[in-house]
Amino acid sequence: MNAKVESLREVFENEEQSIIHGDLHTGSFMVNNDQVKVIDPEFACWGPIGFDLGCLLANLIIDYLFHLTNNEEYCLFIIKIIYNILSTFEKDLSEKIPKNYKTIMIDSAAYAGTEIIRRTIGIALAKEVSIMDEKGNNIAFRKNLLIIGIDLITNSEKYGSCENFIKRIKKLHVN
Protein backbone atom coordinates (compact mmCIF):
# COMPACT_ATOMS: atom_id res chain seq x y z
CA MET A 1 0.00 0.00 0.00
CA ASN A 2 2.86 2.40 0.76
CA ALA A 3 4.13 2.08 -2.81
CA LYS A 4 0.65 2.85 -4.19
CA VAL A 5 0.27 5.93 -1.96
CA GLU A 6 3.76 7.09 -2.95
CA SER A 7 2.76 6.66 -6.60
CA LEU A 8 -0.37 8.77 -6.02
CA ARG A 9 1.74 11.47 -4.37
CA GLU A 10 4.10 11.46 -7.36
CA VAL A 11 1.17 11.80 -9.75
CA PHE A 12 -0.33 14.61 -7.65
CA GLU A 13 2.95 16.52 -7.57
CA ASN A 14 3.97 15.95 -11.19
CA GLU A 15 0.93 15.35 -13.42
CA GLU A 16 -0.52 18.69 -14.45
CA GLN A 17 -3.52 17.25 -16.28
CA SER A 18 -6.00 19.96 -15.33
CA ILE A 19 -6.75 22.78 -12.96
CA ILE A 20 -8.28 21.05 -9.96
CA HIS A 21 -10.33 22.39 -7.06
CA GLY A 22 -8.12 20.67 -4.50
CA ASP A 23 -10.81 20.29 -1.81
CA LEU A 24 -13.92 19.15 -3.65
CA HIS A 25 -16.71 17.75 -1.49
CA THR A 26 -20.48 18.02 -1.32
CA GLY A 27 -20.24 21.34 0.56
CA SER A 28 -18.33 22.83 -2.38
CA PHE A 29 -21.47 23.08 -4.52
CA MET A 30 -24.25 25.66 -4.60
CA VAL A 31 -27.22 24.38 -6.57
CA ASN A 32 -30.53 25.87 -7.66
CA ASN A 33 -33.00 24.96 -10.39
CA ASP A 34 -30.93 26.59 -13.13
CA GLN A 35 -27.28 26.16 -12.27
CA VAL A 36 -24.53 24.61 -10.22
CA LYS A 37 -21.67 26.69 -8.86
CA VAL A 38 -18.48 25.35 -7.31
CA ILE A 39 -17.25 27.47 -4.40
CA ASP A 40 -14.20 27.74 -2.13
CA PRO A 41 -11.40 27.39 -4.70
CA GLU A 42 -8.63 28.42 -2.29
CA PHE A 43 -6.78 25.11 -2.80
CA ALA A 44 -7.05 25.15 -6.60
CA CYS A 45 -3.89 24.10 -8.42
CA TRP A 46 -2.69 22.07 -11.38
CA GLY A 47 -3.00 18.36 -10.70
CA PRO A 48 -4.37 14.99 -11.73
CA ILE A 49 -7.95 14.90 -12.98
CA GLY A 50 -8.81 11.99 -10.70
CA PHE A 51 -7.98 13.85 -7.49
CA ASP A 52 -11.12 16.01 -7.30
CA LEU A 53 -13.37 13.13 -8.29
CA GLY A 54 -11.72 10.97 -5.63
CA CYS A 55 -12.27 13.61 -2.93
CA LEU A 56 -15.94 13.98 -3.86
CA LEU A 57 -16.45 10.20 -3.93
CA ALA A 58 -14.78 9.87 -0.52
CA ASN A 59 -17.20 12.40 0.95
CA LEU A 60 -20.17 10.51 -0.49
CA ILE A 61 -18.87 7.11 0.66
CA ILE A 62 -18.35 8.36 4.22
CA ASP A 63 -21.92 9.71 4.24
CA TYR A 64 -23.23 6.47 2.75
CA LEU A 65 -21.54 4.33 5.39
CA PHE A 66 -22.69 6.67 8.17
CA HIS A 67 -26.35 6.14 7.18
CA LEU A 68 -26.08 2.51 6.12
CA THR A 69 -27.70 0.99 9.20
CA ASN A 70 -30.54 3.45 9.67
CA ASN A 71 -31.59 5.14 6.44
CA GLU A 72 -31.83 2.82 3.44
CA GLU A 73 -33.71 5.36 1.31
CA TYR A 74 -30.99 7.98 1.80
CA CYS A 75 -28.30 5.39 1.00
CA LEU A 76 -30.04 4.58 -2.28
CA PHE A 77 -30.06 8.32 -3.02
CA ILE A 78 -26.29 8.48 -2.37
CA ILE A 79 -25.72 5.47 -4.65
CA LYS A 80 -27.73 7.22 -7.36
CA ILE A 81 -25.61 10.36 -6.97
CA ILE A 82 -22.39 8.32 -7.18
CA TYR A 83 -23.75 6.50 -10.24
CA ASN A 84 -24.74 9.75 -11.98
CA ILE A 85 -21.36 11.35 -11.29
CA LEU A 86 -19.32 8.33 -12.37
CA SER A 87 -21.38 7.41 -15.43
CA THR A 88 -21.26 10.99 -16.72
CA PHE A 89 -17.56 11.29 -15.95
CA GLU A 90 -16.82 7.90 -17.56
CA LYS A 91 -18.80 8.75 -20.70
CA ASP A 92 -17.21 12.16 -21.14
CA LEU A 93 -13.68 10.93 -20.43
CA SER A 94 -13.95 7.92 -22.73
CA GLU A 95 -15.04 10.23 -25.57
CA LYS A 96 -12.59 13.08 -24.96
CA ILE A 97 -9.47 11.26 -23.76
CA PRO A 98 -10.03 7.60 -24.60
CA LYS A 99 -6.50 6.39 -23.95
CA ASN A 100 -6.31 7.92 -20.43
CA TYR A 101 -9.81 7.65 -19.04
CA LYS A 102 -9.37 4.21 -17.44
CA THR A 103 -6.28 5.39 -15.55
CA ILE A 104 -8.13 8.48 -14.37
CA MET A 105 -11.04 6.37 -13.10
CA ILE A 106 -8.64 4.05 -11.25
CA ASP A 107 -6.74 7.00 -9.79
CA SER A 108 -10.04 8.49 -8.62
CA ALA A 109 -10.78 5.37 -6.59
CA ALA A 110 -7.31 5.39 -5.05
CA TYR A 111 -7.52 9.10 -4.21
CA ALA A 112 -10.94 8.43 -2.65
CA GLY A 113 -9.24 5.87 -0.42
CA THR A 114 -6.56 8.31 0.69
CA GLU A 115 -9.18 10.97 1.39
CA ILE A 116 -11.33 8.57 3.44
CA ILE A 117 -8.29 7.67 5.54
CA ARG A 118 -7.32 11.34 5.93
CA ARG A 119 -10.87 12.27 7.02
CA THR A 120 -10.94 9.30 9.44
CA ILE A 121 -7.63 9.73 11.29
CA GLY A 122 -6.27 13.09 10.14
CA ILE A 123 -6.63 16.55 11.60
CA ALA A 124 -9.70 17.49 9.50
CA LEU A 125 -12.12 14.75 10.55
CA ALA A 126 -15.27 14.15 8.57
CA LYS A 127 -18.36 15.46 10.34
CA GLU A 128 -19.73 11.91 10.43
CA VAL A 129 -16.61 10.70 12.27
CA SER A 130 -16.99 13.47 14.86
CA ILE A 131 -20.67 12.59 15.36
CA MET A 132 -19.78 8.94 15.91
CA ASP A 133 -17.07 10.02 18.37
CA GLU A 134 -19.71 11.92 20.36
CA LYS A 135 -22.03 8.90 20.34
CA GLY A 136 -19.25 6.58 21.48
CA ASN A 137 -19.57 4.45 18.33
CA ASN A 138 -16.36 5.64 16.75
CA ILE A 139 -14.12 2.56 16.87
CA ALA A 140 -16.24 0.32 14.60
CA PHE A 141 -17.11 3.20 12.27
CA ARG A 142 -13.49 4.32 11.94
CA LYS A 143 -12.37 0.72 11.43
CA ASN A 144 -14.86 0.28 8.59
CA LEU A 145 -13.78 3.54 6.98
CA LEU A 146 -10.13 2.51 7.18
CA ILE A 147 -10.89 -0.89 5.65
CA ILE A 148 -12.77 0.77 2.79
CA GLY A 149 -10.05 3.38 2.31
CA ILE A 150 -7.36 0.70 2.15
CA ASP A 151 -9.45 -1.35 -0.30
CA LEU A 152 -9.95 1.67 -2.57
CA ILE A 153 -6.19 2.22 -2.63
CA THR A 154 -4.93 -1.36 -2.91
CA ASN A 155 -7.67 -2.58 -5.25
CA SER A 156 -8.27 0.65 -7.18
CA GLU A 157 -8.20 -1.17 -10.52
CA LYS A 158 -11.30 -3.11 -9.41
CA TYR A 159 -13.15 0.21 -9.07
CA GLY A 160 -12.09 1.38 -12.55
CA SER A 161 -15.55 1.61 -14.08
CA CYS A 162 -18.83 3.08 -12.90
CA GLU A 163 -20.46 -0.35 -12.84
CA ASN A 164 -17.67 -1.96 -10.80
CA PHE A 165 -17.46 1.00 -8.42
CA ILE A 166 -21.18 0.83 -7.64
CA LYS A 167 -21.08 -2.97 -7.18
CA ARG A 168 -18.22 -2.71 -4.69
CA ILE A 169 -19.77 0.18 -2.77
CA LYS A 170 -23.09 -1.67 -2.48
CA LYS A 171 -21.19 -4.54 -0.82
CA LEU A 172 -20.10 -2.28 2.04
CA HIS A 173 -21.41 -3.17 5.43
CA VAL A 174 -21.06 -2.06 9.01
CA ASN A 175 -19.47 -4.50 11.46
Locate the predicted segments by residue.
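ATP/Mg2+ or Mg2+-diphosphate-binding catalytic cores
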Residues: 113-175
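Active-site activation/catalytic loop segments of kinase-like enzymes and analogous catalytic loops
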Residues: 50-96, 112-130
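ATP-dependent phospho-/nucleotidyl transfer catalytic cores
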Residues: 1-21, 32
